[in-house]
Amino acid sequence: MNTLHILFAKFRRRALTLAKGIGALLLSSVLLAGGCQQNPSIDQATGAQDAESTPALVTVSPRKSPNDTREYRYLTLPNQLKVLLVSDPETDKSAAALAVYRGSFHEPDSRPGLAHFLEHMLFIGTETYPAVDSFQQYITANGGSSNAYTALDHTNYFFDIKNSALAEGLDRFGHFFIDPLLSPEYVEREKNAVHSEYQMQIKDDGWRGYMVSKQALNPEHPGHRFTIGSLDTLQGNVKADLDRWFAQNYSADQMGLVVLSNASLDDLQALVEPLFNQVPNYNIGPDYPTVPAYTDAQLPAMITSQTQKNAVRLSIAFPVPSTLPYYRTKPEQYISNMLGHEGEGSLHSLLIQRGWIESLGAGTQSFDRNTSLISANFELTQAGSNHVPEIMGLFFAHIDMLKSVEPEAWRYTEQAKVAELAFQFQERGSTVGFVYQMAPRLNEYPPEDLLAAPYLMEGFKPDLIKDLLARMTPENVLVELAMPDFQSPTVEPWFAVPFALTQGPVPVAMPDNPPLNLPAANPFLPENLSLLEPDDAPIDLAVDQPGLQLWLDTDVSFTTPRANIAIELAVPGGLISLRDASMARLFTRLVNDELTQSTYPALLAGLGYNL
């Protein structure tokens, strides 16, 4: 079974908010799932509600971009299952995702990987559709695909399919959560499938780094555990544990469904409501870890580990109180945007000039409902690997510079403008990508903000910014350094990664008067976003002279205020040798590096280039 683990939503250059993935996702293909069995018995005394006796709640229309032509409707079914319906008459595929707000955090200590194992078992069959693997066969036969992943705090199931087959596809999908068979005769097969995924990841540097990072967590926190599962962790009478865990954790009040199709909202509601209202509701309520992820006993700390690939990575992370309650104002984004800036006078620019890094990115991620991580990731050069204390010193000097000045409203306003532009003119991805990203969001934000939440910056809160900065100190830091030539007699127990954990002061060489400056105002932020008048004239050859031709065309059909400019430089004689091609490639990389400082503000404003 193929597995994708999003470990470090990798810090990409020029990104506004990215994340270090200690709260990673385990994404597993369902192509090998199979089997059938009786639905586990559920004790009705646990509080299952009669869905017919509870009226549906009032529907809500989430606020959306003015350029978004889709229609949205949020509703809560009588059984308390949250639903977001999306009508897109232009889509050629329908898609659906259901997130269960229970994941690896909620497993018993004795059964690491049980949530992931249940994810596999649900695809085997249901009482209504008992044929083994029939769901996947139906989806594939109708031009679609399906998948699922198990995260720390939720499990997410999703599929896409041609529009005409949505009704039956959704019915088959819904019965995963109504009458799954969880067949005992397929337990061994799926245990082996889970174990195979575990074995596949043992040499993966993302997984290796993720597992090593757990060594610095509070051992009482559920995030400290192994999560994939293996033959060892799933041995014995796992079927009884599986049935019990399903009955205790898969309840309608802790589920969120997103359905996108070309049908109208009324038609989608008529399809979804009678089906998913059958999912039992046991009113189990939310369940989040209460144990702190890190205590004074864990931090400060530095973990050094071995990589398989020839790459050196440095991560510097600060646990802070969860920033999720402040999603409308995002004080953490003010900080990460400053730390990750790549313009003149930035930390990125200085470290590039010294030849110590290949890239730098900064961002924030929620680890659990109590803790967020503000972090920076560096990809180091070979020279940089010999200057880690100096790099850390410059990083803390940059933080000290931010602390030395009051947070500035004009900077926040500028960042809010960038976020507003990103929301207003966002480009659509795949339908299935949209639904599986939205399903967990139904548990994080109020209905009216489901679409806008990641982009909102609606109030400058300098005190919140200063409070976060005050927590970004060498005494409250987790440093992770991964390099290929590191050796240690201590190995991580599940992935056998050589590592060393040092708890106590981290190596920081503070510089004297480093040449660091805060970013200047961005001159590229647009003021006028009105579209040009439609022009049916043919493409115009505006300039035609020796060595230069310029063609112009006006196209407002995409209703976005963007211009695409393509410039082709003709090389006399062409690239006729391997050396010519190599030199041209090297030239473009050098030019791109040279332009980074001057073009970064333009990139933040939505202007991009590719050489």
Identify what each model region corresponds to:
Residues 56-58, 219, 224, 256-312, ...:
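An aromatic/glycine/proline-enriched structural segment found at the starts
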